A protein has these predicted regions:
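Mobile gating loops/cap/lid regions near enzyme active sites that modulate substrate access
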Residues: 319-343
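Conserved C-terminal subdomain of P-loop nucleotide-binding cores
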Residues: 211, 221, 237, 288-299, ...
């Protein structure tokens, strides 16, 4: 009891807003051992989806996840590595293209909505579908996520010729780490940046407090109990964090992803704008203006305010309720099962809670400290690789990581 009280009161005051749920007090990442089969090496690996099995085990229970490794990163969708390589080698961009890049669950859908509204006029009638994905019939203005749309192992929903025929401005989405980003391929980050400059593509990269991103991905991706996954209960958050901080989740390690894209955004006249979820949350009008400026779009204060209104969490959740999409039912069921506080009617895990600092409801103070320590040490390694001091990101609530 005394230990519990100590743990609760020793919550890291700098990174811990209110809302801690005492039922999570015992979460401890150290009790989980993580395994990768086959062991992940640093060389670029190309294996089909499901070829890598990752798991967290405490000796009594084992929680598995599986991914394909394409270009050395765990692919979020079933991907055919050969198709992916072909896509990488042949895709052509235009200088009117805009890409929203991110590590998953950091506010991609939100920034897509902002970009689409900025480009096409903040007109409610435009109504970019709640999850903004391109669809020839339903949402021809939507974002194109080239990697799964073209390189899917099961079926491609778009050919490269169809992509080439889309009218400007095309909006793309990608979760690729910088060195695997389409159109960049170079032997160094500088060479990749030079390639990116040549394409004329403008990129908005959005980052988020990694703990909020980890929780958000947990509610979308951590496997459900049942025969298929051979687990009796949902994976506990500490097991998830053990995998997450190792990069054994969709799109690999958060830190490498963010640090590298951040470094590229710091180059002189970089085509990449780095924004955080938290800055958008704190001052949406300022964030939307920053994005408009990066895209070279002159917009009045009235236009900006209209974009802010139509990209608010409530406005987007209302859209999602009107237009549920395939997969939403599964996600809603999952989020409800796992107490993810999603509005079952809105049925979209892409619009689950929309808060900053809400990770605190799901972490114990100990888990929070362990997560911070893992973050800091992997950030130090990533920064050393990039040849600079570790960047510090202000994730709001006095949380600088
Ligand atoms: P939560 O799961 O914490 O609610 P992505 O689009 O990259 O998958 O990110 C999804 C996360 O962004 C979800 O976080 C979602 O609720 C949040 N989000 C989406 N639209 C938002 C908006 N307009 N305002 C704030 N958060 C938003």
């Amino acid at each position: 009891m005394l230990l519990l009280a100590w743990l609760i009161t020793s919550v890291d005051a700098t990174c811990n807003p209110e809302g801690f749920d005492p039922k999570n007090a015992n979460l401890d990442m150290a009790r989980w051992r993580v395994h990768a089969n086959p062991p992940v090496d640093t060389a670029r690996t190309n294996r089909a989806f499901g070829a890598y099995k990752f798991s967290a085990s405490d000796g009594r229970e084992t929680f598995p996840v599986a991914f394909g490794m394409v270009e050395g990163w765990p692919w979020p969708h079933r991907c055919d590595p050969a198709k992916y390589r072909r896509l990488h080698a042949t895709v052509k961009f235009r200088n009117t293209d805009v890409a929203v890049a991110s590590y998953p669950k950091t506010g991609t859908t939100w920034v897509e909505q902002i970009v689409l509204l900025l480009l096409h006029g903040a007109d409610a009638k435009l109504d970019p579908a709640s999850r903004n994905t391109y669809n020839a019939r339903r949402n021809p203005l939507g974002c194109v996520w080239l990697e799964p749309m073209v390189a899917s192992a099961r079926r491609a929903r778009m050919s490269l010729n169809q992509f080439a025929d889309l009218p400007a401005p095309r909006v793309l989405k990608s979760h690729a780490p910088f060195d695997a980003f389409l159109g960049t391929r170079g032997s160094t980050d500088n060479a990749s940046l030079a390639n990116l400059r040549q394409t004329g593509l403008k990129v908005i990269y959005v980052a988020r407090n990694p703990k909020d991103a980890a929780v958000s991905m947990y509610f979308q991706r951590a496997p459900l109990p049942g025969k298929r996954n051979n687990i009796k209960r949902r994976m506990p958050m500490d097991a998830w964090c053990a995998l997450y901080t190792k990069g054994y989740v969709s799109c690999g390690a958060f830190v490498d992803h963010v640090a590298r894209w951040h470094a590229v955004s710091k180059a002189v006249e970089s085509p990449v704008l780095f924004v955080t979820y938290e800055e958008l949350k704190q001052n949406p009008a300022k964030g939307v203006r920053k994005i408009a400026d990066h895209l070279g779009l002159e917009r009045s204060d009235e236009d900006i305010n209209a974009v802010v209104k139509l990209s608010s969490f409530d406005a987007m959740a209302a859209q999602a309720r009107k237009a549920p999409r395939p997969g939403d039912a599964r996600n809603a069921k999952y989020a409800t099962l796992t107490n993810g506080a999603v509005d079952a009617k809105s049925a979209s895990s892409h619009l689950r809670q929309g808060g900053a600092g809400t990770w605190v409801q799901h972490f114990s103070p100990l888990l929070s400290k362990q997560f911070d320590a893992a973050y800091q040490s992997t950030m130090a390694v990533a920064a050393a690789r990039l040849g600079g001091p570790p960047p510090a990101f202000d994730f709001g609530h006095g949380c600088v990581m």
